[in-house]
Amino acid sequence: MLFAFCCGAIVANIYYAQPIIELIAPDIGLTPALASLIVSLTQIGYALGLFFLVPLGDLLENRKLMIITNLVAIASLLGAAFAEQPNVFLLVSLLIGFSSVSVQILIPLAAHLAPAESRGRVVGSIMGGLLLGILLARPVSSLVADHFGWRAMFMAAAAVMVFISAVLMLTIPKRQPDHSASYGQLLGSLGTLLRKQPLLRQRAFYQGCMFATFSLFW
């Protein structure tokens, strides 16, 4: 349950801005035509994090990597909360998405730590927390922004990330992956897997379509 909460709270950072863009844009001097860049850059940052940051989970000590990533998220959320210029807000939006991929390091780590007989249940619970975080982020953001202003939402999110970082530091044991490949080789292996595994391509296509459909709705 603890890991499920952490994953849900971390991934929610990607979606907090979406329902309150109409409040953010005029306050930071962003034109309506460019306001959608907030959402786009956050998602682009997440995609970049998946490609460039998550593979480091096979090279670096996992707990340390997650804490550093969370610290970047905290700084980015605070940057969003205090941003006065559109360029600054767009930059930290990219970083918020980039640093939110720590959930994709936490999930396999939790699977590694769980007993074999309960591994599926543990991963399922964590994924449930992740999806719940996505679903609740928008109404929570709207509620907080309506009562306290949109900047308060990012301050609150930063505070939650501080709490999560402390919890992870205290509860997760260190794990140094036993992997001999270099970072470049790991990045290259992503293309190799996609090329040699037709089932992976099929599942990736399905998931991409599902995410696109969900994004259109939510």
Model-derived segments and spans:
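Juxtamembrane intracellular "pre-TM" segments in multi-pass secondary transporters
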Residues: P173-A204
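Extracytoplasmic
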Residues: L2-P32, V103, F217-W218
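Cytoplasmic helix-loop-helix junction between adjacent transmembrane helices
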Residues: V92-G129
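Residue-level signature of mid-helix packing/kink "hotspots" within the transmembrane helices
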Residues: Y15, Q43-F51, V101, I134-L135
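Conserved MFS/SLC helix-loop-helix module at the cytosolic interface between two early adjacent transmembrane helices
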Residues: L48-P86
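Short hydrophobic/alpha-helical segments at membrane-entry points of transmembrane helices
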Residues: N87-S93, Q202-R203
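Helix-loop-helix hairpin linking two adjacent transmembrane segments in secondary transporters
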Residues: G124-I172
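Pair of pore-lining "gating" transmembrane helices in MFS-fold secondary transporters
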Residues: M1-Y16, K196-T213
